[in-house]
Amino acid sequence: MQFAKMHGLGNDFMVVDAVTQNVYFSPELIRRLADRHTGVGFDQLLVVEPPYDPDLDFHYRIFNADGSEVAQCGNGARCFARFVRIKGLTNRRDIRVSTQNSRMTLHVGEDDRVTVNMGEPQFEPGRIPFKAAKAEKTYILRVAQQTVLCGAVSMGNPHCVLQVEDISRAQVELLGPSLESHERFPERVNVGFMQVVERSHIRLRVYERGAGETQACGSGACAAVAVGIQQGLLDEQVQVDLPGGTLHIRWPGPGTPLLMTGPAAHVYDGFIHL
């Protein structure tokens, strides 16, 4: 099986063309391939498939390193867009794709930076999903013998966002796993730790559901900005600094889609016997 290794700001992917190759991935095989010592090693596996809908260009599936399938990955979407152009599967600069539960339009710029229309952030608890009587800008959660304040939003996948004073001292390893599996998030959750530098600039670390802390999380950056805007902390256009690099997010507000722009790097092509 042929594959490519790619990354978006250090969030790394094994990308497989299932348009021209016949492939099947069991959770056990994915876990084996994800192992950084004995396999290929990656945060997520991206599988490019023919479109399920004739109005779209492709469908793509996203699997975490633990073998679980997820519905959204912002960094993965950017790598996906570059992959299908590099491999000659399309020459379009505007690419329409579906994922497990959403549709997106991806634009590949002249500089190979990719802008992803991530759709409108969803704050309604039932759509995240999050157990709450009604939507609030801030929720109080009891976790790891602490009381924390957080925002909750779906960007096609569930996110919990905490504001912290200093990102370097955030309790990512303590609060990340505890919040990820908190009982009020029935499908588990990605946890963002956001430091507001100014209204147009944040620093962010993300503990990803099924993957742990990563170098960058595109949907996590989108979620943090959406929550920050909803809470009145941020402006419409925000620079997000992650450990792996910088993303630019724009969200005019409710009723409009959120746009994420950032790089996607092709590292190497490989072949593996399954």
UniProtKB/Swiss-Prot annotation:
User: Which residue numbers mark the site Could be important to modulate the pK values of the two catalytic cysteine residues?
Assistant: 159, 208
Gene this protein is translated from? dapF
What are the site positions for Important for dimerization? 268
Q: What is its EC number?
A: 5.1.1.7
Q: Where in the cell is it found?
A: Cytoplasm
The record's section on InterPro entries has: DAP_epimerase_AS (IPR018510), DAP_epimerase_DapF (IPR001653)
Protein known as: Diaminopimelate epimerase
Q: Name one GO molecular function term.
A: diaminopimelate epimerase activity
